[in-house]
UniProtKB/Swiss-Prot annotation:
Its EC number is 3.4.21.-. Belongs to the peptidase S1 family. Snake venom subfamily. SMART domains: Tryp_SPc. Glycans are attached at residues 81, 100. The keyword Protease applies. Keywords: Disulfide bond, Fibrinogenolytic toxin, Fibrinolytic toxin, Glycoprotein, Hemostasis impairing toxin, Hydrolase, Protease, Secreted, Serine protease, Toxin. Residues 1-229 form the Peptidase S1 domain. One of its GO terms (molecular function) is toxin activity. This is Alpha-fibrinogenase shedaoenase. It comes from Gloydius shedaoensis. Transmembrane segments: none annotated.
């Protein structure tokens, strides 16, 4: 996260970290949505990875830290054919449930869609410099704004984004605050509701008039709830 500060240790109990199998690299974030399920971005998938819950500092473990591996992974249309503007969402079933503890608690799914102009919080262990490979030991948090989708469509003509999509656009038009590499899959929390999953943005991050895109959680609620309920054939909205 660019332009932020260390998150309060109590404000991110639902934030999980995806690590490579030997814990060498924290490569993505995710959100615990109940005791057995994590929501993240499809582009965070890799063959072997582990999920750490209840962590704050990568160097100083919390007593209630937990580690899990994926038991099952679900994608839209159960394929990985996500594009830059569509279906960048992955639902992970943990190999065993986690109990709530001091630093672990799920975040409920949104009850209403977000509105443009909302203040949204982003968080993660991703890069804190737009140009250098500088990663923090603790998650950083910052507030940005939910913008019109057009604001993400216009600055990136090379992506050929469609006129509408199941993507949210968020950032600060003057730049300086943004998610960055390593923050993918983490939550966008608008007015206290979990509304987005960090999907993609410009490189370097946090440039003026180059906001980032977040998968819209609200549009995928039926799919998420169906999968969790055991209907594994559920398909995402078209």
């Amino acid at each position: 996260v660019i332009g932020g500060d260390e998150c309060n240790i109590n404000e991110h109990r639902f934030l999980v970290a995806l690590y490579t199998s030997r814990f060498r690299t924290l490569f993505c974030g995710g959100t615990l949505i109940n005791q057995e399920w994590v929501l993240t971005a499809a582009h965070c998938d890799r063959k072997n990875f582990r999920i750490k819950l209840g962590i704050h500092s990568k160097k100083v473990p919390n007593e209630d830290e937990q580690t899990r591996v994926p038991k099952e992974k679900f994608f839209c249309l159960s394929s990985k054919n996500y594009t830059l503007w569509d279906k960048d969402i992955m639902l992970i079933r943990l190999d065993s449930p986690v109990k709530n503890s001091t630093h672990i608690a799920p975040f409920s799914l949104p009850s209403s869609p977000p509105s443009v102009g909302s203040v949204c919080r982003i968080m993660g262990w991703g890069r804190i410099s737009p140009t250098e490979e500088t990663y923090p030991d603790v998650p950083h948090c910052v507030n940005i704004n939910l913008l019109e989708y057009e604001m993400c469509r216009v600055p990136y003509p090379e992506f050929g984004l469609p006129a509408t999509s199941r993507t949210l656009c968020a950032g600060i038009l003057e730049g300086g605050k943004d998610t960055c590499r390593g923050d993918s899959g983490g939550p966008l929390i608008c007015n206290g509701q979990f509304q987005g999953i960090a999907s993609w943005g410009d490189d370097p991050c946090a440039q003026p008039h180059k906001p980032a895109a977040y998968t819209k959680v609200f549009d995928h609620l039926d799919w998420i709830k169906s999968i969790i309920a055991g209907n594994t054939d559920a398909s995402c909205p078209p």
